[in-house]
A protein has these predicted regions:
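A short beta-alpha structural unit
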Residues: 36-40, 272-281, 293-295, 299, ...
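Midchain, well-structured core segments that form catalytic/ion-binding scaffolds
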Residues: 133-134, 138-301
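Alpha-helical metal-binding/catalytic segments enriched in His/Glu/Asp
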Residues: 86, 95-135, 223-229, 238-261, ...
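N-terminal capping segment at the start of a domain
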Residues: 2-41, 391
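His/Asp/Glu-rich mid-to-C-terminal helical/loop segments that flank catalytic regions of hydrolases
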Residues: 219, 235, 239-265, 313, ...
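Catalytic-core environment of secreted peptidases
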Residues: 58, 66, 70-103
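Zn-dependent metallopeptidase/amidohydrolase metal-coordination segment
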Residues: 18-24, 87-88, 358-408
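A non-catalytic alpha/beta surface segment that caps or lines the substrate-entry region
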Residues: 30-75
Length: 419
């Protein structure tokens, strides 16, 4: 068998193994008809056990840390060397797909499996972590697992309860973990040299570009606001059009402005009016008040802030012209997370090697890399998903794309770990 044929066979075998393992993980669900696996549930602990077995088979030392992350280490040429950390999350949203998070953990295991089969050790160790909670489905707190690793887990999180009234502290105890030992999950800055995460794109850009893989430039920052137009309710038949103070008409005008201005700004900025409530909400009454939400995101904070200021200014102008009032309250803010430029370049080089060219794009969704990047240089590799669908049972990737992803990821990891 030629080297090319052998490499192709190895790629196909690795991809097939990842796809089969994703199916096995998908079977670990609290509901039979829809994949749901939340933090510290029996299914999460079963997933940890299974992933730990796969890590061990790939030649790794395996442990579960004090916040419920499953971890593995493949030693470097010198024992105790700093590690290149690979990972993603093993928890899901409700009624989830089977690749969000899991693909990154499984592909990372394949990187180590390949080195183990070849009997190779690199200058740096390689560690893999399957984070216990990225989604925040159970407790409404995101990045629990990765914040455990960075040592940025606030003590107040322990008292947060799920819908059944079970606190994080009690859930840890129920899982055989000790809430008093949370800090033991934190890694010293010198333990880790860099972090690389492989993840499905969760959007349509790679598919539209006809590419299997892309490199993330930044994880979008976000602002979320509760907004309100207040006018004057009135009889739908007796108040002339020129005398109306229609809150819904003002909101509709602003929504079109939100769309148009965001498109004009470009720069991968996005804006969404996701909810709208109209009062009094009767067919024969002019709307007197409209409450709506605004979600805006972008890969750089300054353009995002400028867009928000312009949108709020437009809302005030519309309200003033229509003799209404407008108010907005920001209730959520997260800064953009830039990926490390050197690691981006390494990933781009690896992607070009396997698919001929690369594409740089932002991540509109949050990832564990947000927390990890606060401590260590971090970067992400995206894999195309069918139709950009995610957080849904129809979430899908192809084995061919997974094979390319494993190849590119392996190249990048080896370059970083041997530097």
């Amino acid at each position: 068998m030629s080297d090319t044929a052998r490499q192709q066979a190895e790629r196909e075998a690795a991809a097939s193994r990842v796809m089969a393992r994703a199916d096995r993980l998908a079977a670990l669900s609290e509901t039979a008809d829809a994949l749901t696996r939340v933090y510290l549930s029996p299914e999460h602990l079963q997933a940890n056990q299974l992933v730990g077995q796969w890590m061990q088979a790939a030649g790794m030392m395996v442990w579960q840390d004090s916040v419920g992350n499953i971890c593995g280490r493949y030693e470097g040429q010198q024992e105790g060397a700093p590690a290149v950390l690979l990972g993603s999350h093993l928890d899901t949203v409700r009624n989830a797909g089977r690749y969000d998070g899991m693909l990154g953990v499984l592909a990372a295991i394949e990187v180590v499996q390949r080195l183990h089969q070849q009997g190779r050790r690199l200058a740096k160790a390689i560690e893999i972590v399957g984070f216990g909670d990225e989604e925040g489905t159970r407790f409404g707190i995101t990045l629990l697992g990765s914040r455990g690793v960075t040592g940025t887990w606030p003590e107040s999180w322990l008292s947060q309860c799920d819908t059944d009234g079970v606190s994080v502290a009690q859930a840890l105890v129920n899982a055989g973990l000790d809430p008093a030992r949370i800090a033991h999950a934190a890694r010293h800055p010198r333990d880790i040299a860099a972090y690389l995460e492989l993840h499905i794109e969760q959007g349509p850009c790679l598919e539209q570009a006809g590419l299997a893989l892309g490199v993330v430039e930044a994880i979008n920052g976000a602002r979320r606001l509760n907004c309100r137009f207040t006018g004057e309710a009135g009889h739908a038949g007796t108040v002339p059009m020129l005398h109306r103070k229609d809150a819904l008409a003002a909101a509709a005008e602003w929504m079109v402005q939100v769309e148009n201005l965001t498109r004009q700004r470009g720069g991968n900025l996005v804006a969404t009016v996701g909810t709208l409530r109209c009062a009094p909400g009767a067919v024969n009454v002019i709307p007197g008040e409209v409450q709506l939400t605004l979600d805006i995101r972008g890969p750089q904070d300054a353009p995002l802030t400028a867009l928000l200021e312009e949108l709020l200014g437009q809302a005030q102008a519309i309200a003033g012209r229509r003799q209404l009032s407008f108010a907005a309250e920001e209730y959520y803010r997260i800064a953009a997370t830039a990926c490390d430029s050197h690691l981006q370049a390494v990933l781009s080089e690896a992607v070009v090697a396997v698919q001929g060219r690369s594409l740089t794009l932002p991540s509109g969704a949050g990832h564990d890399a947000i927390a990890i990047a606060e401590r260590w240089p971090s970067a992400m590799l995206f894999v195309r998903c069918l139709g950009g669908v995610s957080h849904h049972p129809a979430e899908s990737v192809t084995a061919a794309d997974v094979g390319l992803a494993i190849d590119a990821f392996s190249r990048a990891v080896e370059k970083v770990a041997d530097a």
